[in-house]
Each structure stands twice: as C-alpha cells, then as structure tokens.
C-alpha cells in the first residue's frame, strides 16, 4: 500500500496483534503507522507476518528493532535521513506479507487517519482464490477509486494524489473458495 501523510517522528512502528486487546494497544500508540490482527491457532505471529518493504519518498527505511511485546509483534523503523522530513508530507510505501484464512473470505484494509492519495494492491496469485473482487468505502469530498485487476493474480485500488480520504475509509477484498 502507499499513501501520503505528514510524519511527526523519525522512528515509527508497524505492529501485528493476535487479539483485539493487543490491536487496541497498537491503535493508541502514535508511533504505530500500520497495524494488523493475525488470527488463527496455527499461526505464529513472528513467522506469518513479515514487513517486506518500508519506504518513505522512495528511500528504504531500515528496521531498527523487531520484537514480541505485550502488544503483539512490533517492527520498528527509523533513520536520521527522516529528521528533515518531520512535519512535512511524504509518500509512505508499505509492503506486508501475511497469512489469512481462506475460509474467512474477506481481507479488510481500514484507514485510521486522513490520507491523501492511496494505492492498495492485493496479490493472490498463489492462494487459489476464485471470484476475487473489491468493495471500497471512502469518506471524502468526492473520492473516486480506480480499480484494476489481473484475473487470477491481483487487484489494485488507486486514488489520485490530489484526493483526500478520511478515517473509517477502506476497502474489503472478497473471494469465493
């Protein structure tokens, strides 16, 4: 996913919770840029949730720490290069690799903060899913999402860099098994 926002710090975290209590704790942390809940008795949070890429304005941001805490699994990023960008709008790119039970038949992505411009890609080529589709719900002036799909491979949702969307917006990917 990628979007634009004003950053307030040169360090931030991406978190993965195993229950609602942990997720609530991650939501309360102002340094948590993205959070996810990973449910399933056979899943191991450190193994089944991976941050593949974290970039700001096209630059890779290094992992400075990754650990399991009372809030779940936390992956911390930071760089001295980000200090001049504090209180400025930047383009954030996050790529996550995670497992999701096919039987749930949905994959929701929610926005908790005002966001300008957006790109969300859902790759399912190796997941053996059928009839994959996206339902978006964007709060804003007149946000019009462009949806493109590669049958059997991926769906991409994009909003122009000129469009703002507001909290409680998002997209739900739905499929048949």
Which stretches of residues belong to each language-model region?
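Lumenal/extracellular ectodomains and adaptor appendage modules
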Residues: 1-177
């Amino acid at each position: 996913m990628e979007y634009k926002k004003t950053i307030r710090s040169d360090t931030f975290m991406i978190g993965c919770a195993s229950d609602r209590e942990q997720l609530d704790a991650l939501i309360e942390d102002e340094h948590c840029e993205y959070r996810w809940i990973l449910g399933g008795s056979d899943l191991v949070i450190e193994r089944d949730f991976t941050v593949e890429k974290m970039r700001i304005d096209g630059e890779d941001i290094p992992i400075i720490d990754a650990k399991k805490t009372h809030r779940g699994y936390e992956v911390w990023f930071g760089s001295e290069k980000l200090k001049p960008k504090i209180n400025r709008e930047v383009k954030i790119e996050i790529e996550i690799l995670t497992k999701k039970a096919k039987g749930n038949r949905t994959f929701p992505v929610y926005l908790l903060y005002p966001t300008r411009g957006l790109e969300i890609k859902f790759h399912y080529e190796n997941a053996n899913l059928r009839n994959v589709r996206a339902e978006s719900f964007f709060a804003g002036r007149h946000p019009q999402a462009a949806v493109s799909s590669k049958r059997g491979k991926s769906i991409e949702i994009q909003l122009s860099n000129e469009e703002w969307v507001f909290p409680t917006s998002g997209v739900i990917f739905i499929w048949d098994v």
